Amino acid sequence: MRGMGDDGMGPMAMAPPRSGHATAAAPPPPQHKMAMMMHMTFFWSDRAVVLIRGWPGERGAGMYALCLLFVLALAALTEGLSVLSRRLARRGGGAASSDGGRPAPAPASSAALLTAVHAARMGMAYLVMLAVMSFNVGVLLAAVAGHALGFLLARSRVRPAARDGGGGVACEHGGLPPADGSKT
């Protein structure tokens, strides 16, 4: 006959004594699992792992340079797709309707193209973000340089200032509002 509180599970093991020192060392990790160190602070090395396990890794400075060029190009293309997205949005959805009222809705093909460009831009932006999360300073600098280069080529519209007679460079900020808030 079972007594009160007897659930049939047997006696419970006692908790280890509370003392200032450990009574047993932790067992070593299993040998079949590969230990992988992840940096949580920025570091400078050509032995980084960016986006894909083992890449560029221990493959040397040449592969690291290729990785940096890839991140730079990815960031620049992200800026280029941003401009393309704005142009498609202006072209597809800004036409006035025949009655002079609200703008006519964009055709479905225009909306689908705009959605595809947006999805590609966001995918590239997330890849750049994940690359920067490697905490490698070179990758961070490549991402910033890529965004700057993409902005310069796609959005700033830098061209020679021949028409104003000056020897400088005229710069129009296409798609960006003026800094003073005016509508010019």
UniProtKB/Swiss-Prot annotation:
Residues 1-25 have a biased composition (Low complexity). One of its GO terms (cellular component) is plasma membrane. It is a multi-pass membrane protein. The chain crosses the membrane at residues 64-84, 124-144. Coiled coil: none annotated. InterPro entries: Cop_transporter. GO terms for molecular function: copper ion transmembrane transporter activity. It comes from the Eukaryota. Keywords: Copper, Copper transport, Ion transport, Membrane, Transmembrane, Transmembrane helix, Transport. Residues 1-27 are annotated as: Disordered. It holds the Pfam family Ctr. It is found in: Membrane. Belongs to the copper transporter (Ctr) (TC 1.A.56) family. SLC31A subfamily. Involved in the transport of copper. This is Copper transporter 6. It comes from Oryza sativa subsp. japonica (Rice).
